[in-house]
């Protein structure tokens, strides 16, 4: 008999890094040195709840280090509920990393599959499809793309069941900010062949996508494909979020939580927001100078001081920006990043 009520959690972009593997770089954005402590805080909370499963939508490790995969696989084995994972771009830095990845996570979705995607039923009447969005071009460039073999598999798999289907994929399929699919800075977070993938999912009645990669708390809806994409921020960058979700009678209730302190850093939230603000200026400058805004360096430098926490506020979700003192067109461009419905952190989605 199909389950009509279940609870699950999402923790994304863990970037697990054991101390001896931490990559030191002066402009490093991710607080990977706190990855294990932050994840342990998440798990301590989740283990007090009656969850049916946990989803981790990619970037499980810092840079695909075997010892970091081993640590995570061992830790997931200790949980009182199943966990299901997919690879992110950081987990598969080269094509040679695919086979070991499947070995590490056989118990977390892949079983004895020879391919990095799967379909399973975590509960009666609930289907979970885990996809691999990492693709290497002939020149070795890593992009977000579903290859033809996976597209063929997906087109055959989707019609096999009319069960409620959850799809987990690392790259975004629906835009979470203005022009994400066309802006050079936003494109790399999106699946290149997202339109045919969305068409396949829509034809099968899929309404729920769970993604990561962007390190932003956002829920986007596509009118064209009648589909929600729930992307969850990273546990190693502000605001260190994770989500609890409860499905009941064709509604999905979503609540979001934050890791605000860890044993080694009582003021993690404040420290992390400052860390991000100190390192965001180069990214924000590129955003302002790139098309479609195309500001000059001089114009950009005037605006940057007031945009120190722009990305942190965006990452937190539900942001509402007001730059009334900015000249046009910069004001309209930046205010367009204000959140649009549905809400990003606490919301009930109607799936009827």
What are these regions (language model features)?
Residues 1-9, 119-130, 160-164, 222-229, ...:
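Beta-strand-turn-beta hairpins that frame and shape the catalytic cleft
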Residues 1-70:
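N-terminal active-site segment of His-dependent metallophosphoesterases
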Residues 12-37, 93-111, 137-146, 181-186, ...:
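Acidic/histidine-rich helix-loop elements
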Residues 13, 54, 59, 72, ...:
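Divalent metal-coordination and catalytic microenvironments
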Residues 17-20, 62-67, 89-96, 136-139, ...:
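Active-site environment of divalent metal-dependent phosphoester hydrolases
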Residues 44-53, 127, 141-228, 290-291, ...:
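His/acidic metal-ligating clusters that form di-metal
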Residues 66, 70-155, 159, 188, ...:
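Extended active-site neighborhood of metal-dependent phosphoesterases/phosphodiesterases
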Residues 226-302, 335-352:
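Binuclear metal-dependent phosphoesterase catalytic core
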């Amino acid at each position: 008999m199909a389950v009509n009520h279940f609870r699950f959690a999402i923790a994304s972009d863990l970037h697990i890094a054991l101390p001896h593997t931490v990559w030191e770089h002066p402009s490093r954005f991710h607080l990977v040195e706190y990855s294990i402590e932050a994840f342990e805080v998440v798990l301590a909370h989740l283990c007090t709840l009656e969850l049916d499963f946990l989803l981790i939508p990619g970037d499980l490790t810092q840079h695909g280090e075997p010892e970091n995969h081993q640590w995570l696989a061992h830790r997931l084995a200790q949980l009182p509920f199943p966990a299901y994972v997919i690879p992110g771009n950081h987990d598969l830095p080269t094509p040679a990393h695919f086979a070991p990845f499947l070995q590490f996570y056989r118990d977390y979705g892949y079983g004895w599959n020879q391919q990095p995607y799967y379909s399973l039923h975590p509960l009666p009447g609930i289907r979970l499809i885990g996809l691999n969005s990492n693709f290497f071009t002939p020149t070795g460039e890593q992009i977000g793309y579903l290859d033809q073999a996976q597209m063929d598999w997906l087109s055959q798999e989707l019609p096999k069941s009319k069960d409620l289907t959850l799809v987990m994929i690392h790259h975004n399929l629906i835009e979470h900010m203005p022009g994400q699919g066309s802006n050079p800075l936003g494109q790399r977070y999106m699946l290149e062949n997202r339109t045919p993938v969305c068409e396949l999912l829509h034809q099968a009645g899929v309404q729920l996508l769970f993604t990561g990669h962007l390190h932003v708390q956002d829920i986007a809806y596509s009118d064209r494909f009648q589909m929600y994409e729930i992307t969850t921020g990273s546990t190693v960058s502000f605001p260190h979020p994770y989500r609890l979700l409860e499905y009941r009678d064709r509604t999905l209730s979503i609540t979001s939580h934050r890791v605000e302190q860890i044993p080694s850093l009582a003021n993690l939230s404040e420290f992390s927001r400052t860390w991000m603000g100190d390192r965001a200026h180069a990214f924000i400058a590129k955003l302002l100078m790139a098309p479609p805004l195309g500001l000059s360096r001089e114009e950009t430098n005037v605006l940057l001081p007031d945009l120190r926490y722009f990305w942190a506020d965006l990452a937190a979700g539900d942001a509402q920006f007001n730059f009334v003192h900015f000249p046009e067109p910069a004001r309209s461009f930046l205010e367009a990043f204000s959140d649009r419905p549905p809400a990003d952190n606490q919301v009930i989605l109607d799936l009827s």
